[in-house]
């Protein structure tokens, strides 16, 4: 049981070489996220709480929004570290962030100030671990990325209290890709 509030984070899109919504890797990632979230929802998950980073965080919001018709009580929160989060992004990425923030049940900045110092990012990570009951990361310690800091914070929280940390690793993604390929092949053979 992951509890009622789940922090979802992980790799940035560029760390996985996913560039665009038609990338085949994205379908695998979203399928893996969907399967895991559905399992948690069936166990009583109420809130998905994530950030706005380009990559796993935004993909998790997209997947969660797609699950809301099946789980009408499911809520989604997008928290960002500071008020001007994403302002350095290109116009398309800023628009995507704004659109997703407009579709979730709750969105706010942890620090009610524009970016000033790295301590705001540390405060954000602390906020996420304190205000959730568990963490799900699309992350593999054998392939470090920026989510390493989130992983370390989640593991540190798990050392202090009951705070399950579940990873979707590269091996897990490979298994999902194989299952999807087998299902597609079976479908093709049956047509």
Swiss-Prot record:
State the SUPFAM superfamilies in the record.
Answer: MCP/YpsA-like
What InterPro entries does the record point to?
A: YspA (IPR010697)
Please, which domain of life does this record's source organism belong to?
A: Bacteria
One of its Pfam families is YpsA
- Transmembrane region(s): none
Question: PANTHER family this protein is in?
Answer: UPF0398 PROTEIN SPR0331, UPF0398 PROTEIN YPSA
Entry similarity comment: Belongs to the UPF0398 family.
Full protein name: UPF0398 protein LCABL_17010
Q: Which organism is it from?
A: Lacticaseibacillus casei (strain BL23) (Lactobacillus casei)
